[in-house]
């Protein structure tokens, strides 16, 4: 990085105060590697670069430097991990990019561009300017091969913010669905309390006192991502993997949990929704104070939880989340669903009649599951989906797209 700065100084371009074009392929060094191998350098960069926030990777500061090296009117182009498009730690970088003009972003994530690197790449071409023209359009391109385009969308820059770039790569009808989904300005965290279930330290403390027992007085069941299905806890049905341990009936005593964290104890003893953390769709289950959400789950507390449970487990919400965060999916299409993804779900205004209808249907599902965990509740879930489609204002053609996914 220092040699690049020295090179810029040596060229001495006072008339333009920068380069006409900056092109680069930054090193793909992730935050964990930097912390372990170059912690002092990472700390220095965090103080120098405004975009180096959160668990940032090395490419973030390279792009910021590249934009800074351009004169006002210069062009920059980079090949990058597609984490640029939606990762939380690239939000500051996206803010910097949208201040200027985005000429195009190409998504190569489905192609083996780098044979020996586990990276899903994209390319970006941008124009540094002090007078952004919001009437200009940006191109968002999905590549079929390295040379062949599968789909190209043109989007006015005035509607491009610093979040949700994934949607600009989608088809016109998918874009319309997401536009309706995001049109509701109340988000989930405005009405409910969203909490990460455990810190790393708490997770390891829990491991020390976790035990296996089908029955246990003054204790709590424990579930995690692998033992949660939509509406259904798989406790006692499916074994739980937890930090190199395996439990069929995982429990923790109330006193042990109180010792680890009084706050976690109070959360566990409360009515709540527990959401799985790693899944291809949202999987949320209701709990009335009998269960502790283990490592990697998210907890939601507040009123009207049965109404919210119906929304979260609906096809439309999972469809939308999968599009909005497509570029940060892992192998197999799995998405790390945490507090950020949950908090920002738009919540439509429901009339008392519609809300009561959803709550009644959710009650019906929960009653069926209580009687028999294997009982089919798809007819009730489909009725909830129909009400959710209406709340978000989807057309029949848009509903078909969601249902087909």
Q: What are these regions, as identified by a protein language model?
A:
Residues 10, 22-25, 29, 44, ...:
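Generic, well-ordered alpha-helical scaffold segments in large soluble proteins
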Residues 60, 67-70, 173-354:
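Polybasic, glycine- and aromatic-enriched phosphate-binding surface used to engage nucleic acids
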Residues 88, 307, 356-358:
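Residues that form or flank phosphate/diphosphate-binding pockets in enzymes
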């Amino acid at each position: 990085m220092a040699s690049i700065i020295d090179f810029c100084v040596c060229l001495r371009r006072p008339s333009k105060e920068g380069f006409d074009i900056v092109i680069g392929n930054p090193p793909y060094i992730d935050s964990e590697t930097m912390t372990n191998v170059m912690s002092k350098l990472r700390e220095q960069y965090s103080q120098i670069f405004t975009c180096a926030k959160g668990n940032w990777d090395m490419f973030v500061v390279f792009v910021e430097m590249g934009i800074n090296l351009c004169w006002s009117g210069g062009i920059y182009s980079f090949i990058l991990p597609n984490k640029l498009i939606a990762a939380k730690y690239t939000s500051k970088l996206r803010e910097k990019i949208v201040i200027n003009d985005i000429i195009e972003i190409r998504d190569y994530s489905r192609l083996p561009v780098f044979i020996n690197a586990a990276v899903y790449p994209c390319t970006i071409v941008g124009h540094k300017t002090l007078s952004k023209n919001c009437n200009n359009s940006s191109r968002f391109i999905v590549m079929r091969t390295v040379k062949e385009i599968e789909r190209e969308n043109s989007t006015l820059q005035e509607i491009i913010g610093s979040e949700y770039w994934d949607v600009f790569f989608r088809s016109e009808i998918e874009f319309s669905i997401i536009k309706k989904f995001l049109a509701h300005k109340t988000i989930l965290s405005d009405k409910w309390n969203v909490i990460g279930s455990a810190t790393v330290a708490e997770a390891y403390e829990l491991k020390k006192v976790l035990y296996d027992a089908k029955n246990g007085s003054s204790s709590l069941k424990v579930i995690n991502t692998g033992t949660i299905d939509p509406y259904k806890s798989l406790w006692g049905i499916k074994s739980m993997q937890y930090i190199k341990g395996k439990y069929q009936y995982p429990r923790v005593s109330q006193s042990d949990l109180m010792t680890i964290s009084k706050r976690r104890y109070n959360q566990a003893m409360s009515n709540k929704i527990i959401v799985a953390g790693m899944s291809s769709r949202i999987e949320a289950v209701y709990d009335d104070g009998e269960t502790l959400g283990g490592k990697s789950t998210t907890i939601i507390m507040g009123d009207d939880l049965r109404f919210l449970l119906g929304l979260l487990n609906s096809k439309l919400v999972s469809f939308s989340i999968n599009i909005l965060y497509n570029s940060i999916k892992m192998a197999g299409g799995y998405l790390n669903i945490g507090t950020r993804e949950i908090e920002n779900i738009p919540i439509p205004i429901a009339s008392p009649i519609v809300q009561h209808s959803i709550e009644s249907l959710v009650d019906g599902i929960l009653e069926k599951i209580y009687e028999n965990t294997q009982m089919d509740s798809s007819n009730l879930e489909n009725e909830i989906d129909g009400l959710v489609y209406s709340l978000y204002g989807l057309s029949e053609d848009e509903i078909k797209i969601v249902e087909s996914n």
